[in-house]
């Protein structure tokens, strides 16, 4: 089975000693399915993981990502800026790419020159110049981004800031009048600036180029056909900082949701705008918790708070939120 999958994914079937990645494109009557294949050698043989990307579900629009109304207004204001870096952070599989593609769709206009550098290109978009990284041919994130800056782009999307070179070029692009969108692996929004400094970017460059950070997670949505309302225990409510007597819903399972109690997913978000106060904290080398305190004081909702709002609204369960967020 693994050999057949590797053939379909254009992966070297004779190589079983190192990890490999590939791609399978399946066209059906109604949609195009993109399968990402990852192999990993173990002591018992190769482990194969398939990740399904449905091209038809890529452009869901900002209003369908799970952003609260006030958060959508904030995001619209952020991406309307002419220059600066906007980072989307979170672990693998947290919906970062979907958020970036939704933002690109919002920004896409015939007169706007948008160029992306991706590895891999997950979804093809009309009217946007997308570049596939090919390290074997020498086309790295850094090399592609360096060339992009000579193409007079208005907006630039870099799939991921992986190294110092890419980070330096992203900062340079932002400081020379481009809006740069990218992703980073951090646990929360305030940690993004610290991560850039740790990578080797000078604090004054981070503070002057970073526009905003959006941290996110995905939670499963409760099936509205079978969810069951209950009152949150007082101790739990006290621990979470929500009013006593608050109600939430728990999953039950039915035919509609195939017995899981859940149907669909929604994002929860932590949006930090980098204003003058936070810029000064970055310049001073402040710790992440200090930056977080200032951001909260200025109105930022943490991932936990955003998740609890969805719990109280009946969108997801308390267990889902506690599983993906920290207090």
Residue ranges with predicted function:
Residues 1-327:
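Short, flexible helix-loop junctions that flank or precede catalytic/ligand sites
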């Amino acid at each position: 089975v693994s050999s057949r999958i590797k053939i379909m994914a254009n992966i070297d079937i004779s190589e079983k000693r190192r990890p490999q990645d590939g791609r399978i494109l399946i066209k059906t009557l109604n949609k195009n399915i993109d399968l990402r294949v990852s192999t990993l050698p173990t002591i018992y043989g190769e482990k194969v993981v398939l990740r399904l990307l449905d091209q038809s579900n890529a452009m869901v629009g900002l209003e369908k990502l799970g952003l609260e109304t006030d958060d959508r207004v904030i995001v619209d204001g952020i991406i309307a800026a002419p220059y600066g870096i906007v980072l989307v952070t979170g672990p693998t599989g947290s919906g970062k790419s979907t958020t970036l593609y939704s933002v690109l769709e919002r920004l896409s206009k015939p007169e706007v020159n948008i160029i992306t550098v991706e590895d891999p290109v997950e979804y093809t978009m009309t009217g946007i110049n997308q570049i596939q990284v090919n390290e074997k041919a020498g086309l790295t994130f850094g090399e592609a981004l360096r060339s992009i800056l000579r193409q007079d782009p208005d907006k630039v999307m870099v799939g991921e800031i992986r190294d110092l070179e890419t980070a330096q070029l992203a900062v340079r692009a932002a400081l020379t009048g481009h809006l740069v969108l990218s992703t980073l692996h951090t646990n929360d929004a305030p940690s993004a600036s610290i991560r850039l400094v740790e990578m080797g970017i000078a604090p004054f460059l981070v503070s002057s180029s970073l526009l905003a950070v959006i941290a996110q997670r995905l939670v499963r949505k409760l099936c509205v056909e079978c969810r069951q309302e209950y009152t949150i225990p007082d101790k739990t409510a006290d621990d979470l900082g929500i009013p006593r007597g608050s109600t939430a819903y728990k999953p039950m399972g039915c035919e509609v949701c195939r017995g899981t109690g859940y149907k669909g997913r929604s994002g929860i978000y932590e949006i930090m705008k980098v204003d003058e106060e936070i810029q000064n904290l970055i310049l001073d080398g402040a710790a992440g918790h200090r930056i977080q305190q200032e951001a909260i004081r200025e109105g930022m909702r943490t991932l936990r708070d955003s998740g609890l709002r969805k719990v109280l609204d009946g969108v997801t369960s308390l267990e889902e939120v506690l599983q993906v967020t920290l207090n």
